[in-house]
């Protein structure tokens, strides 16, 4: 039973990843639980590669070690051909008992089923009877491609863990919030959380549970103790989770998602400050950062004013960069939104873009003719495109940084790009650059 479905499952599109992998990734963020994959070694191995990707990337790029990402809390039943023929339930139960008999058993064992265990009909719910006072057994019937894509597995983990762990009858704690739906694979997730946590601390607001990101069994169990829930992303999945928690637990959600850029961050702080009677502190934070924002914007405006910007992106919310572009006097000539499996429906609260051409489900084949017709000075996209002879290109992150200066930092980069020449110190190397890079 999966009442909350991914776009791929609803539209019967080719799958993007498998449900087992998505469920494993999200479940592993319950950091003090053991995540038990009822699968062959190969399936577990692939999931561990996904789970550890952010940690490995951080280690290689910055030299920082994130043990929770590099050494995930994952075990496997290591299903064999014998299990596939005669059934793997005995193997599963034996593995669970071995974990329970360890010197320090975890508060929870989350069992996730895979394609092989689903195909042969192993019922992982058989292990529920092994729960003890110290350790709760939780099951997620993901069953790989049999159930759906990666996002479907995420949704199943979200809802299954919530229904089996969260206690409804629990006392509310004043000035406490939960954070819902952070993007766990994005490398800036922890940095974004810490930045906004600093703002919350200044307004005397504490965080209980991060659902589901680097959190604990106890904080998830006490989810309903929070006074308010903060949604990190109000996209397709974020809105599903908001709807789920409202229907299942009567949860209250803050109307704004995590803010990106100066205007969104200011509005977010003012609204949150009003809710928690901390308006003075919110205004103080905004004033401190507004001075910095305006002074830095003055430096880039002379170089960017009047420049034409064209955007081709999978992102469905762009107000943070549109605001920054408008603040420095740029002209936005076209916004092209590509079809994306994780979101749908372009969203903007800016009246300033009413006269701007916005195309959803943009056809990439129109790119060349649009560039020739609109003659943009800069093209913004999610990927590094083929070199354009007539303009500068730059990339837009799928998961931008939160806070006041996200859009500002991007337009500052554009300003530096316009100040540079491809020729640089190599003088005539521009011909070689154009010849080979444009292929």
Regions found by a protein language model. Name each.
Residues 1-439:
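An N-terminal assembly and electron-transfer interface module characteristic of large anaerobic redox
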């Amino acid at each position: 039973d999966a009442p909350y479905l991914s776009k791929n499952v609803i539209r019967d599109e080719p799958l993007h990843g498998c449900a087992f992998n998505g469920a494993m990734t999200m479940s592993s963020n319950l950091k003090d639980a053991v995540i038990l994959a009822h699968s062959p070694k190969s399936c577990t191995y692939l999931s561990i590669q996904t789970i550890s990707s952010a940690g490995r990337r951080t280690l290689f790029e910055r030299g920082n070690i994130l043990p929770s990402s590099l050494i995930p809390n994952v075990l496997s039943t290591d299903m064999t051909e014998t299990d596939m023929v005669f059934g793997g339930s005995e193997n599963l139960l034996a593995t669970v008992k071995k974990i329970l008999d360890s010197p320090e058993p975890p508060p929870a064992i989350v069992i996730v089923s895979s394609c092989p265990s689903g195909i042969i009909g192993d019922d992982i719910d058989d292990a529920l009877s092994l729960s003890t006072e110290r350790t709760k057994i939780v099951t997620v019937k993901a069953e790989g491609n049999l159930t759906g894509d990666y996002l479907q597995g995420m949704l199943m983990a979200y809802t299954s863990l919530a229904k089996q762990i969260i206690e409804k009858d629990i006392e509310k704690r004043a000035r406490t919030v939960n954070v819902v739906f952070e993007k766990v694979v994005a490398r800036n997730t922890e940095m974004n959380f810490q930045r906004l946590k600093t703002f919350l601390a200044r307004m005397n607001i504490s965080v209980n549970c991060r659902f589901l990101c680097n959190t604990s069994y106890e904080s998830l169990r006490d989810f309903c103790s929070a006074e308010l829930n903060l949604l990190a992303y109000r996209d397709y999945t974020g809105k599903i989770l908001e709807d789920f928690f409202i229907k299942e637990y009567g949860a209250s959600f803050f109307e704004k998602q995590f803010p990106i850029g100066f205007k969104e961050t200011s509005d977010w702080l003012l609204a949150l400050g009003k809710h928690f009677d901390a308006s003075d502190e919110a205004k103080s934070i905004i004033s401190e950062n507004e001075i910095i924002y305006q002074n830095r914007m003055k430096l880039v405006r002379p170089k960017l004013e009047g420049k034409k910007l064209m955007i081709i992106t999978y992102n469905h919310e762009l107000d943070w960069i549109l605001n920054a572009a408008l603040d420095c006097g740029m002209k936005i000539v076209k916004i092209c939104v590509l079809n994306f499996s994780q979101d749908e429906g372009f969203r903007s609260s800016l009246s300033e873009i009413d006269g701007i051409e916005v195309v959803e489900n943009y056809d990439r084949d129109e790119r060349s003719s649009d560039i020739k017709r609109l003659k943009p000075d800069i093209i913004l996209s999610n990927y590094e495109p083929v070199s354009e002879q007539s303009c500068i290109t730059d990339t837009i992150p799928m998961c931008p940084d939160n806070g006041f200066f996200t859009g500002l930092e991007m337009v500052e980069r554009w300003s530096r790009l316009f100040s540079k020449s491809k020729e640089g110190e190599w003088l005539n190397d521009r011909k070689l650059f154009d010849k080979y890079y444009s292929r």
